[in-house]
Curated annotation (Swiss-Prot):
Source organism: Homo sapiens (Human)
Protein name, as recorded: Beta-adrenergic receptor kinase 1
Gene for this chain: GRK2
Gene3D superfamilies assigned to the protein according to its UniProt record, in alphabetical order: Phosphorylase Kinase, domain 1, Pleckstrin-homology domain (PH domain)/Phosphotyrosine-binding domain (PTB), Regulator of G-protein Signalling 4, domain 2, Transferase(Phosphotransferase) domain 1
GO molecular function term, any single one: G protein-coupled receptor kinase activity
Site (Required for receptor phosphorylation): D3, L4, D10
Length: 689
């Protein structure tokens, strides 16, 4: 029966994988719902306050670029040639061979440069043209040939074109997507969890599918009780920090994190899913690798280490078991549990795996940095070629003996190794850090320039264009059987109680890596959801054509901000009422079904603007004169933050104005401001957009 369950688990997992690759959006069991377009008023202010409404910030984001591109290609004739030129250059930069670049560079030059020069309408500098002409004249076609044009295209898009984008519906859509992104609160219900694929000291790793996009991931679940029992809180939190540091920027050679969240019992990391097993497993199945095969793995691992080291992260646990293969055979460095940030202080702890640890790591009290990883790389490459670490002779398992040999033994390299390989390994396995390859001041570049890698084009390595020496079998789960992986004994943690103080440690644990979420959405449901939302909004516009839109009331007035909130201000009502609110310098108005035409609170009536919590939801509490209160609930975190800020600012400015104006004797002040009266102070733009 157990065997049947294992087979069914494997079949279910493999089917989910195949469907996710083919049509991930069709596998989405939840739907992302974009907020109303009116969210723009709040989100634009929220993003502006954080310096996010700039050309550079929006153009560099995946969804921002896609919406900006759509606007330029379909709604702004003068910008279309610039964006088309930009996209052709980006395609050129990814070409694999020089022959392809020669042909494509000439096509780009003829279509986008020479054609415009002949028409006397070339909007670029003479120096950019001469740069490209000079290289083409010498038949030089580097990947960055058109870089001067990239800079000038962006400069041309940065001004009026970008401003028109900000004023368009496409920027409104960007605000809608950013609101969704900034309000992500993941739980286990957001994933379909499949079979177990691994186990570690604190928990298990499962294959899983994200419900709203259909994308497959690995879910690493750490048990909070087991962490507490082993006093591993610092390690668990450190892994989250290290993953957040390395998971930004384009690096296909590290198992990166897209999300982190926690439940009352578990910490969960959502990671890249690697289906091809690890190099330790394949070394045992395949036998030792040839120099050529090892060169492939070494090159991709070097780029992974370079990505970490550029972010001041030392990995400290490089070994074949931590190098995972994807379904195509390319590799990624996994498990950053022992990684360390050395940007402010160098580590000196002796951590890692015996047989791969650098001498400076083994020596107590000695500080080190990325140097440790280059020594470990030498040990690992030796193992791929010989089947054992250079310091683990005769399969000894005595850790002290292995460490002693690491500190004292001169490594003897077999005569069968090529001179280039010997040079590489001798450089990496130098006990003296000051003489070690990769530690002489230029980091990974020194290793990449080794004669052993002379035949490689590092751009092609980065683009994963070289064929892997080993392709994992398709249609198989390249992981141990679920029953062989086993499970933890629940009795171990039976007496462990999680206190509020334990949970407080993980208060800031949840995280969404923005660029990885945007990439996931772009690859799966972006077009579908945009099309569906366009249809819904078009129907709503047609329906409301005669009635008018809520936003229209703010037009031409000194409205600071407007949008939907839910209120609970009547002492006899316990239900939330969704209304459309308008914040002016001297009052807060709202409209909705069943409301009086002049529903408002003046700033004179408000005594304070505070944050409170009702049924675990953060809310705004407006304390009103006479002991009354007015409670507001927002649909998302950014809205709550921005409404609180703007309400407090308006209240503070109104108070300051009252203090500056001399009090008029014997003239009572009305607590209600008529809508027709001139506002006290003008803050913000005319319509808050």
């Amino acid at each position: 029966m157990a065997d049947l369950e294992a087979v069914l688990a494997d079949v279910s997992y493999l089917m989910a994988m195949e469907k996710s690759k083919a049509t991930p959006a069709a596998r989405a069991s939840k739907k992302i719902l974009l907020p109303e377009p009116s969210i723009r008023s709040v989100m634009q202010k929220y993003l502006e306050d954080r310096g996010e409404v700039t050309f550079e910030k929006i153009f560099s984001q995946k969804l921002g670029y896609l919406l900006f591109r759509d606007f330029c290609l379909n709604h702004l004739e003068e910008a279309r040639p610039l964006v088309e030129f930009y996209e052709e250059i980006k395609k050129y930069e990814k070409l694999e061979t020089e022959e392809e670049r020669v042909a494509r560079s000439r096509e780009i030059f003829d279509s986008y440069i020479m054609k415009e020069l002949l028409a006397c309408s070339h909007p670029f500098s003479k120096s950019a043209t001469e740069h490209v002409q000079g290289h083409l004249g010498k038949k030089q076609v580097p990947p960055d040939l058109f870089q001067p044009y990239i800079e000038e295209i962006c400069q041309n898009l940065r001004g009026d074109v970008f401003q028109k984008f900000i004023e368009s519906d496409k920027f409104t859509r960007f605000c809608q997507w950013k609101n969704v992104e900034l309000n992500i609160h993941l739980t286990m219900n957001d994933f379909s969890v499949h079979r177990i694929i691994g186990r570690g000291g604190f928990g298990e790793v499962y294959g899983c599918r994200k419900a709203d996009t259909g994308k497959m991931y690995a879910m690493k679940c750490l048990d909070k009780k087991r962490i507490k029992m082993k006093q591993g809180e610092t390690l668990a939190l450190n892994e989250r920090i290290m993953l957040s540091l390395v998971s930004t920027g384009d690096c296909p050679f590290i198992v990166c994190m897209s999300y982190a969240f926690h439940t009352p019992d578990k910490l969960s990391f959502i990671l890249d899913l690697m289906n091809g097993g690890d190099l330790h497993y394949h070394l045992s199945q395949h036998g030792v690798f040839s120099e050529a095969d090892m060169r492939f793995y070494a090159a991709e691992i070097i780029l992974g280490l370079e990505h970490m080291h550029n972010r001041f992260v030392v990995y400290r646990d490089l070994k074949p078991a931590n190098i995972l293969l994807d379904e195509h055979g390319h590799v990624r460095i996994s498990d950053l549990g022992l990684a360390c940030d050395f940007s402010k202080k160098k580590p000196h702890a002796s951590v890692g795996t015996h047989g791969y640890m650098a001498p400076e790591v083994l020596q107590k009290g000695v500080a080190y940095d990325s140097s440790a990883d280059w020594f470990s790389l030498g040990c690992m490459l030796f193992k791929l070629l010989r089947g054992h670490s250079p310091f683990r002779q005769h399969k000894t398992k005595d850790k002290h003996e292995i460490d002693r040999m690491t500190l004292t033994m001169a490594v003897e390299l077999p005569d069968s190794f090529s001179p280039e390989l010997r040079s590489l390994l001798e450089g990496l396995l130098q006990r003296d850090v000051n003489r070690r390859l990769g530690c002489l001041g230029r980091g990974a570049q020194e290793v990449k320039e080794s004669p052993f890698f002379r035949s490689l084009d590092w751009q092609m390595v980065f683009l994963q264009k070289y064929p892997p020496p080993l392709i994992p079998p398709r249609g198989e789960v390249n992981a141990a059987d679920a029953f062989d992986i086993g499970s933890f004994d629940e009795e171990d943690t039976k007496g462990i109680k999680l206190l509020d103080s334990d949970q407080e440690l993980y208060r800031n644990f949840p995280l969404t890596i923005s660029e990885r979420w945007q990439q996931e959405v772009a690859e799966t449901v972006f077009d579908t959801i945009n099309a569906e939302t366009d249809r819904l909004e078009a129907r709503k516009k047609a329906k409301n054509k005669q009635l008018g839109h809520e936003e229209d009331y703010a037009l031409g007035k000194d409205c600071i901000m407007h949008g939907y909130m839910s209120k609970m201000g009547n002492p006899f009502l316990t239900q939330w009422q969704r209304r459309y609110f308008y914040l002016f310098p001297n009052r807060l108005e709202w409209r909705g079904e069943g409301e009086a035409p002049q529903s408002l609170l003046t700033m004179e009536e408000i005594q304070s603007v505070e944050e409170t919590q009702i049924k675990e939801r953060k809310c705004l509490l407006l304390k009103i004169r006479g002991g009354k209160q007015f409670i507001l609930q927002c649909d998302s975190d950014p809205e709550l933050v921005q409404w609180k800020k703007e309400l407090r600012d308006a209240y503070r400015e109104a108070q300051q104005l009252v203090q500056r104006v001399p009090k008029m004797k014997n003239k009572p002040r009305s607590p209600v401001v008529e809508l027709s009266k001139v506002p006290l102070v003008q803050r913000g733009s005319a319509n808050g957009l």
